[in-house]
Amino acid sequence: EISTAEELLDMAQKINSGDQEAAHGNYRLTQDIDLTGVEWEPIGSPGLALILERERMYGVVNTQGFQGVFDGAGHRITGLEYSTETREAGFFGCIAPNAEVRDLTVEGTVLSTPEDYWDLGHDTAAAGGFAAAVVNGAKVENCHFIGSVDGYGTVGGFVGLLCNDPGADKLELAEPAIKDCTFQG
């Protein structure tokens, strides 16, 4: 159970440091959380890379992507302010296959401006208010992002990129990966 901004940030830092138990954990919010003044670190962010090859996009999943269950229990996370020049931007960085995220509203501002964007060649950045990337096989239901998102590369109000599991030949969605979710900005 998570009830404070400190507990939420601690969870993100454990996942991003490679703690597999944390990455596969089962989390539930017990109250609304205000992130005002918190130096946020997207959940499951480091190592996500996007490769552009002949105008066809493939997602490459990081080992630190969120792979567990996150139940917002109808609560809100407010005050998110995240800006980066070097990595994926969103409340979640990468929601990996088999992960489930549900019943959560996030409010805030997400900005991704890689300083070397034009020099990246085949690499790019992803930015989305709720998640930078959602990988096929993940389930995100009844989640909402209220705020603003700005960036280069693959950018979306709710999610920046819906990408394929690298083990699959093509992107096939057997059932909706993102269901009953909204963006207001």
Which residues does each predicted region cover?
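Surface-exposed repetitive/solenoidal architectures
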Residues: 1-185
